[in-house]
């Protein structure tokens, strides 16, 4: 038996090589892997000695040789292949262990294009693909996490075709991921990220019980190990719908730096939000906005879930809590609640991934765009359109309202008072209907909107929403502007003594 080991990530390769040697494998290797194995007392043959061909062009050509690829690719059960192998002095290679030049890491560490180009692996993917193609005869490894499993399988004599088939699938996933990143990087560097092709590659984290509905399959995939590093289940398992709501709640609650923010989300839209002096008070005021919709919702906590906050949340049924951190006493509060699910990022404050791009599936393809973000100075740079200026406290509330609006399905309007959302209308086909729905819900909840501020993610097409806002005592408004009737909206704000700001930035969300 013969194995070829050539890896960039050398974690565990010495131990793996020793185990293979003990199992009777002859070992071939290249470059740094060869040196490391030899230094650790493993009998190893350098590929250039095996092929009788030196490495060429500063190592660009090492394993691209018939004795390597012929040794991997020839079928052991095909008499003609066996004959050709003997005639050409090609010896079988039964195990290929390769991982690739660190192209992605290089692009993160350096902007030197020559260095980046040199870290595009050629021979590695070729060997992986060859071994994967001939999986019926050859084992292929590209992940150090598989070393132990492979050794155990070999020792037990369970190296069957089905085992190798699973390694083959993983190998093609690995090379596809590698090539996709290279293509995306080149398009990002030279075509602004919008080239002729776009590759979206994620790594599976776990299967969900089902998809959005019970008859659909579902799973969570991640970019750059984000969930593996920042998502830990303390109680229960996340469903497909939980994950989309967690995403919405986390994005909103984490948008205010280290502020003690609480966001409550249901079906992707906020039904409660507040920033008060502490997390308990933030939760109390967030819940007031719409305690009915909060039932069975997702609560995101930008800080630590402690016992006091846990007891307060436990007064009603929420399905999911996502907190930056959770202490043991808080977890004990929910011990008797079977249905609640609790997740943490094990961090002082909530962490967002800040993905650079966003995409949505449409039948026949997908649409792709830069991710939307509310700029740090968006409100600061907004243009005052009215005669009246907002007070310092009103400006704080306007910033909160503006960010909530950006994370809420269009059309929406958001009313905020003293750091807490007091009314919201969202997902409406008419902005005036959103305004009326928000006010009606606030009245139902017994909330006083007098002195609140108002934000809209897109312009007001008519003055009717301003007229409606005046009836409940709105004092300041922020919106993008851009309507052909902006003058009417400004005039209405002045009539009612409101402060009105145009940001010039729309935040549609569909």
Swiss-Prot record:
EC number from the UniProt entry: 2.1.2.3, 3.5.4.10
Gene Ontology terms for molecular function: IMP cyclohydrolase activity; phosphoribosylaminoimidazolecarboxamide formyltransferase activity
Residue ranges annotated for the MGS-like domain, each copy included: 1-142
Classification via PROSITE patterns: MGS
Record's GO cellular component terms: cytosol
Keywords for this protein: Hydrolase, Multifunctional enzyme, Purine biosynthesis, Transferase
Pfam family of the protein (one): MGS
SMART domains: AICARFT_IMPCHas, MGS
Pathway where it operates: Purine metabolism; IMP biosynthesis via de novo pathway; 5-formamido-1-(5-phospho-D-ribosyl)imidazole-4-carboxamide from 5-amino-1-(5-phospho-D-ribosyl)imidazole-4-carboxamide (10-formyl THF route): step 1/1; Purine metabolism; IMP biosynthesis via de novo pathway; IMP from 5-formamido-1-(5-phospho-D-ribosyl)imidazole-4-carboxamide: step 1/1
Catalytic activity reported: (6R)-10-formyltetrahydrofolate + 5-amino-1-(5-phospho-beta-D-ribosyl)imidazole-4-carboxamide = 5-formamido-1-(5-phospho-D-ribosyl)imidazole-4-carboxamide + (6S)-5,6,7,8-tetrahydrofolate; IMP + H2O = 5-formamido-1-(5-phospho-D-ribosyl)imidazole-4-carboxamide
Matches recorded under InterPro entries: AICAR_Tfase_dup_dom_sf (IPR024051), Cytidine_deaminase-like (IPR016193), MGS-like_dom (IPR011607), MGS-like_dom_sf (IPR036914), PurH-like (IPR002695)
GO biological process, one term: 'de novo' IMP biosynthetic process
Record family assignment: Belongs to the PurH family.
Record remark: domains: The IMP cyclohydrolase activity resides in the N-terminal region.
NCBIfam families on file: PRK00881.1, purH
Name assigned to this protein: Bifunctional purine biosynthesis protein PurH
